[in-house]
Amino acid sequence: QIGVLRAFKQAGVPIDRVAGTSMGSLVGALYALGMGIDDITEINREIWIDGKPLSDYTFPAIAIVRGRRLHNLVKHTLHGRKIEDMPIRFFCVSGDLTATDLMMHDHGTQWEGIRASGSIPGAGPPMFLNGHILVDGGVLNNLPGDLMMDRYTGAVVAVDVNPMASMTVPA
């Protein structure tokens, strides 16, 4: 995702809207805030390598990690900023276990939507928000390009970070 943003910047391709799911929601939000590619790379390094967000193990009744580190790192990075105040339009998605539907986060506090979008079931605890139990958006829509096309006109570029089937080793 960061590589695609870097290539677009180098090629002078303007980006006027960003959407993301799971890890892509954090990268997209940082870009939509107007951060440079090097800053986004550094923040991701601070969160995922230096911050060790997945090292707060717990008895796996709900998940293998408590999720407090990641929760605090995302909240600290994005502060109390609102999605609707971002310089570039942004949304991210999470899976709503309460309504058994996709939840689109296009307004409200950034860190809450991003934290919900990256709550991988079993790995980390779900996000409880406004009476909803939210998990990683990839459970229902790992590539929200279709949602972007439904909402906005113009070209949509979607970045799928899942490996191609032909790249996996057969069993």
Question: What positions do the PLM features span?
Answer:
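Patatin-like phospholipase
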Residues: 1-21, 29-171
